[in-house]
Structure formats: structure tokens, C-alpha cells
């Protein structure tokens, strides 16, 4: 859907692009008699190995679950430190904290909102066990430089690729090597309502992740050879129940087939916004300097009151009154109650400046050109108020 009329009702910040194909995929699973983890999970994992070029893929119930068991598999715990930007979804910091480790929050580049190799390296101590860079809003972080730091210091790198299905860095899909975690949450570029997936080139890590995601058993929830759980399965280590159902996996597979089309439409809307914003005081994010393909998970503007004549919160409220939804990605983690009290002296100037000004505009594949024009017209009316 490219042209068309604007939505007559409220234009949400995001909406999943679901069609008859997803309904048919769910129907097929329901009629198969195997509705929990099964062949659709295996197909999804194989498809992500093909997409990324990585060796192993492990489907899980959410990206948060994936982060939890990845940190556990790396034996991160009390006394350890994990470097992460503060400008990220709080689940990463929560998982680090729940394992007894310390999140070491670092600043981001002011205009791309990417964590920088320099910020990461300056935060390394003898206690650092992992680095978690975020591929933010659909653009890639400078992962070669970050991975080189990890290799130099012997520190694991876990890529937060929740925004990065369809993101390419120097000609390769994010997650082509190392370990990366993707999200299939409802607002993501492909979705199955809730779900996630880990890719890795570490066979031992992959084996541990499969155990940890399913009760610590020595097999996955489904085994192709026995058409069910092997009867000799036993607990090898305490684990969780983070497996993905085949209902969800079937939806994700169907969405993955549409990925190029879905992301092309996102790119068209983003270009429409970019052209209009050139004449407005609202500041979009800068694009990374390295070669990349942007997945346009989010389209973010910065609303500086002195420059724009209106505050971010006032703009979001005014857009809501005009029938337009917005998002905030993210409120800096270190400014939120628990982390503010835990790290009261932490100052991250670029993160804080942006956290007070960022606003995510509506961006989803089923938006029409008229929908985007509606947003642009509202921004034009509100600029300078």
C-alpha cells in the first residue's frame, strides 16, 4: 500500500502488517496437531541461518529471554561487569542485574545514537565480561570495530539486533558472525506477536542455549529424528521454559518471506519524512558513515524546544490531538528510578540530551503516502509554535 487515502481513524505509531498468508500459516499449524515447538521452529532457525549467513540459530519466546540465557551461558554473574548503552530497552539492564552483575552504561554518539568503540573501550575494566552494542532504529553500529575490541581484550560481544532484521553492515546481514539477538515483538520489522531468535557461530554456546531455553534438558523441545522429545532426555543444568511455539514460528516465517517488501515500504516512508524535514526544525538522526542498508525500524526526530518552539512532550500531545500516535525509544535507563538510585552520579550527556528530545514518528508498512503526508502537515503546523 503506497498511495491511497489517509486512515480515517487514529494513525498509530506502529501496526503489524498481517494478511491472509499469516492466517493460513496459523491454520496449517493448528490443523497439524503439533502446535508447540516443532517443525516450524526448525524451519525458522534454518531461514535465519540463510538470512544472516551464521551457523546456528535458536528460536526463543522473546529477545529478552534470548538475552537472559545468552548471559547465563557466558556465566556472567556476581562481580562481573557488562558494558551497554543506557539508551536501550531496559530488559538488557534488567537481565544483567538479575544475574547479579553490574551494567556499565556508556554514552552514545549524539546524532546517530550508536554506542561508539571509544566509549566501550574506555569503560573496560578487569571485571568486564561482555559488551552489548545496540543496532539502533534499524541502522548498524560499527560492529567490526567493536568486535575487534572484544577480541583484543578477550571479552564476549552480544549484538542487540532487536531493531535489525533486514539491516546490513558492509554488505553482510547483521548477525553474520559472532552472536546476535533478534526480536519478533509486535512493532518489529517482522513479528509473530512475541518471539525472538539468537544466531551464533559458537557451537558450544548454541548447545548451551538450547539446553537453557528448555528446562536444561539435553535436547530441544522437538527432535526431527524421533518426532517428539527423546525419551532419555534428562536435566543437564537448571534451565527455563523459553521455547517458541510453532504457531508463533509459522507467523514469523510468513513475515520473513515478506521482509524485502515490508522494509522497502518502510524505506519509502522514511524518505518521504526525510525530504519534508529538510525544511523543518525537527532533527532526524544522522546515518552511520560506514556502508550499510538501513532497515528503518524507527524514524526518530529530536525536538529541541529552543530550536523548534515546542517541547517534545507538547509535540507528542499535539500530534495525539490530531489523531497521530508517537513513540519514545528510549527513556535513558540510567534516569529511571531503580538505575538512578543505583548509579546516582552517572552522567551521559549525549544520551541525556537525546532522551529528553527524541520522538518516534509513525512508521509501518501499511501506512499510505497520505498517512505520511498527514504527519508531515501536522509537523509543519506545529513547527515554531
Curated annotation (Swiss-Prot):
Cofactor(s) needed: pyridoxal 5'-phosphate
GO biological process: lipid A biosynthetic process; lipopolysaccharide biosynthetic process; polysaccharide biosynthetic process; response to antibiotic
Record keywords, A-Z: Aminotransferase, Antibiotic resistance, Lipid A biosynthesis, Lipid biosynthesis, Lipid metabolism, Lipopolysaccharide biosynthesis, Pyridoxal phosphate, Transferase
Catalytic activity, as annotated: UDP-4-amino-4-deoxy-beta-L-arabinose + 2-oxoglutarate = UDP-beta-L-threo-pentopyranos-4-ulose + L-glutamate
Function description: Catalyzes the conversion of UDP-4-keto-arabinose (UDP-Ara4O) to UDP-4-amino-4-deoxy-L-arabinose (UDP-L-Ara4N). The modified arabinose is attached to lipid A and is required for resistance to polymyxin and cationic antimicrobial peptides.
Family: Belongs to the DegT/DnrJ/EryC1 family. ArnB subfamily.
Protein's name according to its UniProt entry: UDP-4-amino-4-deoxy-L-arabinose--oxoglutarate aminotransferase
Biological source species: Escherichia coli (strain K12)
Record lineage: Bacteria, Pseudomonadati, Pseudomonadota, Gammaproteobacteria, Enterobacterales
Gene: arnB
